Amino acid sequence: LGLFVIVATPGWQYWNKDPKFGELVHQNTREMIRRDRNHPSVLMWEPILNETRYPLDFALKALEITKEEYPYPGRPVAAADVHSAGVKEHYDVVYGWPGDDEKEDKPKQCIFTREFGENVDDWYAHNNNNRASRSWGERPLLVQAMSLAKSYDEMYRTTGLFIGGAQWHPFDHQRGYHPDPYWGGIYDAFRQKKYAYEVFRSQSPASLQHPLAECGPMIFIAHEMSQFSDKDVVVFTNCDSVRLSIYDGTKTWTKPVIHAKGH
């Protein structure tokens, strides 16, 4: 299996104007790069504080550190949010969203979405459509799956400036600031699959064979045939066509699978 890693400096949504604070963050970055710079899976460094307002000189010094600690050809690139100070003008890769590559003031660098499929995470956003507990049943799980499918599809409808993204988060988990768990995973906290898992599995080629991965031809019927189920039957598959039958084959439907945008 292929694996790439974005190594991020510790810190989130907090800045202190005391110069010592910035110095300690930069020291964290140096130690982080020294720890991981010989790992071939490292694709990017994220040397700034996540979702934090920081001054321009801090951002430029952080970028300089990534070059000082790995001053060789083919070094991992430095990435940060496109709207943060100094990033759009100086960094190697910027964090953005599908559509940023088509704006008049688009960045010159490649764009990567590091948390796709997620809406703004405030107190009310816990109710958004990409979050569903397995205990809620068929309809909420289908809404979540289709929401993530839409986010995934949007990344394919971009220019070559946009290079991909990573989903947040694979697993349901507890959080410190909300009484309810985060329900946005494609697995629950016990690693049980949701419908959304099948969405992403259906994006792998049917011809793929790998000893460590669930692969090959697949089909998943996202329908429980209960009294609460929708009239439409949603199927996730990587095959060319699907044949559904009910009542011992007395009714059968065969439908082609249309793969838009190559996925």
Predicted regions and their residues:
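Substrate-binding/catalytic cleft of secreted carbohydrate-active enzymes
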Residues: 1-196, 216-219, 257
